[in-house]
Amino acid sequence: MEDKRRRARVQGAWAGPAKSQATAQPAPTAENNLQQRPGKAWMNKEQHLSDRQFVFKEPQEGVRRAPEPRVIEKEGVYEISMSPTGISRVCLCPGFVDLKEADSVFEQLCRDVPWKQRTGIRDDVTYQQPRLTAWYGELPYTYSRITMEPNPHWHPVLLMLKNQIEENTGHSFNSLLCNLYRNEKDSVDWHSDDEPSLGRCPIIASLSFGATRMFEMRKKPPPEDNGDYTYVERVKIPLDHGTLLIMEGATQADWQHRVPKEYHSREPRINLTFRTVYPDPRGAHW
C-alpha cells in the first residue's frame, strides 16, 4: 500500500500545478472569427465577398402577362386583329350626329320608343335584363333565348338615322335593336352578335346618344387556352353623345363586346344597333 502512495506522488509531480478554473479565456472577436478556417459549406477564407459571382438563370418558361387594353378615342378605321377567319375592323366617328340634333333625337326616343325590360335565360336560370330594349324590323330576332317579335312600324327619327348611316357608310340595314341604359347599374354582358340569322361577318352600326359609356371588347382565346380570357387582347372605346361605331369583318367571329356597370353615377344612354337579318339562315352570306 505504501508503494502505491509513493508512485502516485511521483506521477503527480510531473503534472505541474493545476490551472485555476476561474482563469478568464479571451473573448472571440470578429478578427479571430475571420481567421478561422470555414467548413466545406462556405467559401475559401481568402476570397472576398465582392469576388463572389452569382449566376442568374432564366426561368425555363416565360412569365405570361395580360396585355394592356388598347384605347381607341379618335376618328378612324382600326384593324384590331387578323386571323384565318379574316380581318376584324372597327370604324369610329365621333360627332356623327351634331350636338343640337343629338339632343333632340335623345329626347324623342326616350319619350316615343316602346321600351320594355325583358326576361333572359342563362344556364337555365331566368333573369331580368339590366336595361330596356325595343326592336324594329320586318323579321323576328332571337338572341340569348329571347325572341323579339317583328315590328315594321319604324319611328320617323329612326328611319332618318338609318338612311343617314347608309348614305355615309355604303352599308344597308333592315333591322334595329334599341337599348336604353337608365343609369350606371344598367349593362350588357360579354357577347358576340353572331346569331345565324345575321349571316357570316355581319356589319353592326352602333349609334349612341346621352351619357358616355365605355364600350369594351376582348378577343376570343385560342383553343389551347380552353376558354380562358385572362391573357387575351382587349380594346376600350368611350362612346359619346352622337358617336357612330361600325363593327365589321371578322369582329363578331373573333371578338366579344360589352357595356359594363360603372361605379360612378351615370345619366341615361340610348344605343341604336342597326343590322341586317336574313329570313332564312341558309340564305345568308355564309
UniProtKB/Swiss-Prot annotation:
Protein name, per record: Alpha-ketoglutarate-dependent dioxygenase alkB homolog 3
Residues binding 2-oxoglutarate: N179, L180, Y181, R269, I270, N271, L272, T273, F274, R275
Keyword hit for Ubl conjugation: yes
Primary gene name: ALKBH3
PROSITE patterns according to UniProt: FE2OG_OXY (PS51471)
Amino acids binding Fe cation: H191, D193, H257
Gene Ontology terms, MF aspect: broad specificity oxidative DNA demethylase activity; ferrous iron binding; mRNA N1-methyladenosine dioxygenase activity
Single Gene Ontology BP annotation: negative regulation of cytoplasmic translation
